[in-house]
A protein has these predicted regions:
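ER/secretory pathway lumenal C-terminal domains and tails of membrane proteins involved
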Residues: 1-214
C-alpha cells in the first residue's frame, strides 16, 4: 500500500492529499470542500502568487487528440468532482451537487473524453439523488442505449457488477416504465425459468402492466 497505512488520515484537497491529525469517519467523504471546490471550479489567470484553481487547458477542445492514456488520466479529475458531489449530497446541498456535476461535464465533456458505461450510470444516479430528474433522464438515456447493446451482444451477462439487466431495471424503475421492466424480466425468465426471484418479479410487473401482451 503506497499510503503506508495512513489512508484514514489523508484528506483530499484536489490532486493531492493532506496528512491530518484526524481520522476519517466511516461513510464520509474525507475532503476539504472549500479547497476542493476552489481547485475544481474557480477560473484563475497567471500569477506569481498562489491561487487555487486548475486550468483544465485543452480538455474541452475538439481539435486536440486524446489517446487512451490521456483519457485514463483525466479520470483523476473526474474522481475529484465526484467526491465533491457525494460530499454535497451527504450534506443535503443538492444544488451544489448538481452544479458540480455540470461543471465536470463543461470542463471534461464526455463527447471528447468518453466515460465508460459504468461511470455514466453512476453519474446519472448522482443527478437522481440530487433531485435533477431531467438530467438523470438525459444521462440514463445514453446508459440505456449502451446497456441494450451489451444485452444484445451477451444476453447471459448477469454476473458482472454493471450487468445490463441490473442497469436497465434500475433505470426503468426510477422512470416508472413498467412496460420496459416487464420486457427485462421476460428476457431473464427465458434464461432462468425456475428462478423464484425472477418469477416473482415477472408476476409483479405483469400486474403493473395491464393490457400488455405477456405471452
Amino acid at each position: 500500500d503506497s499510503k503506508i497505512g495512513l489512508s484514514d488520515y489523508l484528506r483530499m484537497e484536489g490532486m493531492a492529499f493532506r496528512l491530518v491529525p484526524e481520522k476519517r469517519k466511516s461513510n464520509d467523504e474525507f475532503i476539504e470542500p472549500n479547497v476542493l471546490k476552489a481547485n475544481l471550479t474557480e477560473t484563475v489567470g497567471y500569477s506569481k502568487n498562489y491561487q487555487p484553481g486548475f486550468k483544465f487547458r485543452g480538455l474541452n477542445d475538439s481539435t486536440i487528440f486524446f489517446d487512451d492514456n490521456h483519457k485514463r488520466m483525466v479520470q483523476n479529475y473526474r474522481n475529484a468532482f465526484l467526491r465533491l458531489t457525494l460530499y454535497y449530497i451527504g450534506q443535503g446541498q443538492n444544488d451544489l451537487a448538481v452544479n458540480t456535476l455540470d461543471a465536470m461535464e463543461e470542463k471534461l465533456p464526455n463527447k471528447l473524453l468518453s466515460m465508460d458505461y459504468g461511470l455514466l450510470y453512476e453519474i446519472s444516479n448522482l443527478y437522481l439523488r440530487a433531485g435533477a430528474k431531467d438530467k438523470f433522464n438525459r444521462y440514463s438515456g445514453e446508459v440505456e442505449k449502451l446497456a441494450l447493446a451489451k444485452l444484445e451482444k451477451d444476453p447471459k451477462d448477469v454476473q458482472s457488477y454493471y450487468n445490463p439487466y441490473r442497469i436497465l431495471i434500475d433505470i426503468y424503475e426510477a422512470q416508472g416504465r413498467n412496460d420496459k421492466l416487464l420486457e427485462v424480466w421476460q428476457k431473464l425468465a427465458t434464461i432462468f425459468p425456475a428462478d423464484p426471484n425472477v418469477k416473482a418479479n415477472l408476476q409483479k410487473d405483469r400486474n403493473l402492466s395491464p393490457g400488455i401482451d405477456t405471452s
